[in-house]
Curated annotation (Swiss-Prot):
GO terms for biological process: translation. Located at the top of the head of the 30S subunit, it contacts several helices of the 16S rRNA. In the 70S ribosome it contacts the 23S rRNA (bridge B1a) and protein L5 of the 50S subunit (bridge B1b), connecting the 2 subunits; these bridges are implicated in subunit movement. Contacts the tRNAs in the A and P-sites. Part of the 30S ribosomal subunit. Forms a loose heterodimer with protein S19. Forms two bridges to the 50S subunit in the 70S ribosome. The gene is rpsM. Gene3D superfamilies: 1.10.8.50, 30s ribosomal protein s13, domain 2. GO terms for cellular component: cytosol; small ribosomal subunit. Pfam families: Ribosomal_S13. This is Small ribosomal subunit protein uS13. Residues 94-117 are annotated as: Disordered.
Length: 117
């Protein structure tokens, strides 16, 4: 199992798919990383040499991923809540932020229905 940015990358998958298991790396960034390092995106992780894995680790280290990114996102949400702006209030009330209707939908965001007795 290859370990990149503190995450075990699945060895049986292609490198592009394996990189996407790291929080903060999506399809575009995974393909860009392969292009920068001149790796074939269809290469399986198990077939990649250790020196190439070191190059991948160095490239991924340039990005903000995993714990740092999660911390930044949570701090951004906390800042919105502290400001008391519309988005912060919606976060605080666990309601949709971007103008979706809430009369009939938004069950995922609101949580299960509360029983009225």
């Amino acid at each position: 199992m290859a370990r990149i940015a503190g995450i075990n990358i699945p060895t049986h998958k292609h490198i592009v798919i394996g990189l996407q298991s790291i929080f903060g790396i999506g399809d575009t960034r995974a393909k860009a990383t392969c292009k920068i390092l001149k790796l074939d995106p269809a290469t399986k992780v198990v077939d990649i040499a250790e020196d190439q894995l070191e190059l991948i680790r160095a490239e991924v280290a340039k990005y903000e991923v995993e714990g740092d990114l999660r911390r930044q996102v949570s701090m951004d949400i906390k800042r919105l809540k502290d400001l008391g702006c519309y988005r912060g209030v919606r976060h605080r009330k666990s309601l949709p932020l971007r103008g979706q209707r809430t009369k009939t939908n938004a069950r995922t965001r609101k949580g299960p229905r509360r029983l009225i007795k």
